[in-house]
Amino acid sequence: MTNQLRWLALYKKAIRNYIIKNGKPDLVHVHVPFKAGILGLWIKRNYKIPYLVTEHWGIYNNLIEDNYVSRGIAFKRYTKKIFQQASQFISVSDYLAKGVNRLVGKKEYEVIPNTVNTDLFFYKEKENSSLRFIHVSNMVPLKNAEGILRSFKKFIQQYGNVELIMIGDKGSVIRNYAKSLDFPIGALRFLGEIPYTQVAAEMQKADCLILFSDIENSPCVIGEALCCGLPVITTNIGGIPELVDQSNAIMIEPKDEESLTQAMHEMIEGINKYDRKKIAENAIGKFSYSVIGKQINVVYGEVLASLKQ
């Protein structure tokens, strides 16, 4: 509690100093209601400045352990109040917004997806001819990296010149499990945690992103892969169906390793049907900073206009 109070005091001081120096802003944009929304409430009460809120946090389900329902009374009370007093609610997916409305309370919303740095993630023609799958995540259990490894092991029993790149593991658990599967030399590489720029470079050298999660909201990694022109194999969960379609993805059910192996076969056998340049072009038109920025500016204008009525 002491740390929370210190955090609030520091931010309140910073906000006061900002207003003294620059004057009052017309609008405050809160990202993730708790804890930033507490400051939004304080600013609204003390300075009469309205705020809107964008929610990214995928806790409004019963699949993750640390979900909204499991949280304490204070968390729920403040979250509900933050949404109620917001002048507008933006969600990164329709799936997430419906979860908020189901558990927190009814609130009209706009869907604006997560953005992608298209200066890093863009189409680049592959320099190598070898076929390559790529997986990028923190590899916590809900990402089901072990299921990817088992499915890929079955896949390479029929295909030789195919590689799987795993990016983002923080420890030895997944690597040790991979060793137990006894992959052929050159079939599997772990790159660990690497700089963001290198993630983009590795995607540009790959042929397909694999995401086999048990639960997701609106994963940034899919937008990043699409902006590089990569088709995607992904589970049909959460907000993912809002990001992909048949022109750029194969969707399967979570935990279905047989379907994942089959999707790998389907992807490699039909890889030439995917127009990577068009995938990238469409994705940049959906996720780039400029596109998302324009959508947010429209919402700002609508909120400010409604307050003048």
PLM features: residue spans?
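Membrane-proximal helix-turn-helix segments that form the acceptor-binding/catalytic region
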Residues: 45-46, 71-89
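Short alpha-helical donor nucleotide-sugar binding micro-motif in glycosyltransferases
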Residues: 83, 193-194, 201-206
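Carbohydrate-associated surface elements
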Residues: 95, 115
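Conserved donor-binding/catalytic core segment of Leloir-type glycosyltransferases
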Residues: 125-152, 165
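Nucleotide-activated donor-binding/catalytic signature segment of Leloir-type glycosyltransferases, i.e.
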Residues: 175-194
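Aromatic "clamp/platform" in nucleotide-sugar-dependent glycosyltransferases that forms part
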Residues: 214
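Short hydrophobic beta-strand element within catalytic cores of glycosyltransferases
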Residues: 231-234, 251
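Conserved acidic donor-binding segment of nucleotide-sugar-dependent glycosyltransferases
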Residues: 246, 250-257, 266-272
